[in-house]
């Protein structure tokens, strides 16, 4: 049985924290912050690989991964790319903006169109695009940082997502460590300005994120790499039987706490279904 995040008691606590966060925004401390909370079970007995396969039937995503490190298992169906390098080209694809899918084609198209035109969702996305552009400009060739797609809406199995694509060119001698140091943690999971947003959400969030909102990927022998953003993910300790997942959303001045809470429930739906 999963606890935290379910029921009226935690919902009230969540809404109170959103009010505190919006006070920071209204004071000008930050423009946007990604606030997350955790659902967990302390006595879960699952087959991690089976749950991963089940999750990817329910919510097939392009940046999914199953990763095992001794007793820890990451069961991830992420739709989001943090950063990809192909020779001298870098690509980042932050996600901000989510709406549900519907089995009715007409309703589903309307949901997609509404997301595409939603001024709040577009504002959230554009703020993070600006942050990513700034991060990438630290190590990219001057004038090479370009926004290739802005606020494009893509359908996934469970949700519609608003995605932007930023590209740049880097010197062939640039070390991977410099790229990661200059851009991690990713703006879509922190906020803007990044450092101040991180300090505020660290104070407000009740549990540490751990691997959640981090990145998993590969590096080839030529220095090319591809990393996801660890979201829509279950993390399982097969020794202690602790199972958890985080969900979150971007908070801005226009955010309504009840709507943000509902968005978190939507994002958590596939993880819950994968366990049944």
What are these regions (language model features)?
Residues 11-24:
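Phosphate-interacting basic helix/loop segments used at nucleotide- and nucleic-acid interfaces
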């Amino acid at each position: 049985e999963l606890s935290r995040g379910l029921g009226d008691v935690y919902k009230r606590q969540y809404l109170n924290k959103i009010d505190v966060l919006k006070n920071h925004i209204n004071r000008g401390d930050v423009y946007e912050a990604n606030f997350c909370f955790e659902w967990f079970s302390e006595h879960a007995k699952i087959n991690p690989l089976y749950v991963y396969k089940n999750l990817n039937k329910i919510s097939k995503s392009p940046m999914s991964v199953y990763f095992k490190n001794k007793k820890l298992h990451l069961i991830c169906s992420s739709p989001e790319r943090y950063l990809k390098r192909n020779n001298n080209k870098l690509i980042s694809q932050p996600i901000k903006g989510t709406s549900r899918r519907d089995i009715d084609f007409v309703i589903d198209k309307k949901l997609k169109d509404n997301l595409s035109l939603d001024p709040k969702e577009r504002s959230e996305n554009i703020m993070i695009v600006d942050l990513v552009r700034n991060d990438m400009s630290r190590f990219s060739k001057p004038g090479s940082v370009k926004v290739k797609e802005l606020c494009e809406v893509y359908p996934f199995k469970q949700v519609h997502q608003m995605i932007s694509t930023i590209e740049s060119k880097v010197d062939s001698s640039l070390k991977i460590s410099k790229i990661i140091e200059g851009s991690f943690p990713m703006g879509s999971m922190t906020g803007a300005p990044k450092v101040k947003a991180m300090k505020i959400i660290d104070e407000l969030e009740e549990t540490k994120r751990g691997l959640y909102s981090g990145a998993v990927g590969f590096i080839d022998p030529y220095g090319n790499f591809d990393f996801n953003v660890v979201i829509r993910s279950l993390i399982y300790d097969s020794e202690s039987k602790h199972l958890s997942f985080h969900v979150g959303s971007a908070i801005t001045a226009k955010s309504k706490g009840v709507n943000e809470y509902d968005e978190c429930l939507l994002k958590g739906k596939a993880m819950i279904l994968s366990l049944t």
